[in-house]
Amino acid sequence: VLGATQKNDGNISGNGYIVTWAFGHLVGLAMPDAYGIENFRRENLPILPQSFQLIPRQVKTDKGYKPDSGTVKQLKIIKEVFDQCDKIIVATDAGREGELIFRYIYQYLECRKPFVRLWISSLTDKAIRDGLQNLKDGTMYDNLFRSAKARSEADWLIGINASQALSIAAGRGTYSLGRVQTPTLAMICSRYLENKNFVPQKYWQLKLQTGKDSIEFSALSEEKFDSQQPAIDKLQIIK
């Protein structure tokens, strides 16, 4: 669509454009050790950074977390592209997380180049061409970014503090809590306990048998009755 056909390491160029990409969140919020807080100690809680630091995506190793080499390489390529361009066309997903992916990279690389937004929901050639003809000012999505940033920081505050608090209270092991994962796990556990403690009970339903033009069919009520009499009463109403 753009006419950029020259494939390079980490980008594609041509026709006045350089196209590069991110693979997920290349930049995220730093862990507590970046603020000088190491190990799980009760006196450190709650951990409330004055301002959050951005770092490249980390991977866990035997010696702790370290920057992912592929992420660091791609960020270097993106910075080189930013340095070469006059203006940035942001083409990340048209949504909150897509906006956050770009803005965190933009902030981490301390870029000051102006940017506009390609806002499309289809990846057909026509949709892309139409979107390029109707680029939006990047500032139009500042509030979308702020909402994504608030979600990201809230997840950090809840996850870090709750995980450390539970681990300290338990006295051994490391336990992970999160805004999404913990309620989801609670739903799974609740359902498991319901099934485990389930005791079969007798119930009644209404069944209707009817037909038309020699075609017979039956219908079963969604409502279930704990005893027979309420079912009979409802049946009389229907009749």
Question: What residue ranges belong to the model's regions?
Answer:
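Prokaryote-biased recognition of long, low-complexity C-terminal linker/tail segments
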Residues: R151-E223
